[in-house]
Amino acid sequence: MNRIIEANFLPAPVEEAKEKPRILIIDNSRDFTYSVKLGLERTGRYSVWEENEPARAHQTAQRVKPDLILLDIAMPETDSGEVAARIESDPTLHRTPVVFLTALVTKSEVRSGLQIQGHPFLAKPISIPELVAGIERNLPALSHDGHIASLQHVTNN
């Protein structure tokens, strides 16, 4: 006896695990990047890379291809604005959001929506829940395969 099984009764295909958004932290403090990496990875939401040598930041970003970059604004002997500009001028990275991290502002200035050199910023010290909220505010929409999705604007006439 042959049985016909309708498609409605078959289990849904198991969706492959989506790639987590890639976050790159650029800060000269190894202790800071390590603790942030650990905290973010414990949320289970992100894959996190660290770069503690600002001179290698652009090269690391090219290799990692992050979905978002957290960049310390006050690193010795480094102009973080130049680091951000190099990343933004790279055709493979120009759409990657850069969020500055700084101890030079207050949390109320962050809440006011001010920007530094056209970039959003988060105040240090920062808790992991605050950091996750800041990342989620600035993380672009990701496609099903885990890469940045291009957004299309549709208007109704």
State what each model feature region is.
Residues 50-68:
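Acidic, metal-coordinating helix/loop segments flanking the phosphotransfer/catalytic sites
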Residues 7-16, 140-157:
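CheY-like receiver
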Residues 30-49:
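Two-component/phosphorelay signaling modules centered on CheY-like receiver
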Residues 37, 81-82, 94, 105-123, ...:
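Alpha4 helix (beta4-alpha4-beta5 surface) of REC/receiver domains from two-component response regulators
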Residues 75:
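Receiver (REC) domain active-site loop signature in two-component systems and cognate sites
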Residues 52-53, 79-85:
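Acidic catalytic/metal-coordinating carboxylates
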Residues 126-136, 143, 147:
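C-terminal output helix
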Residues 72, 102:
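Active-site residues of response regulator receiver
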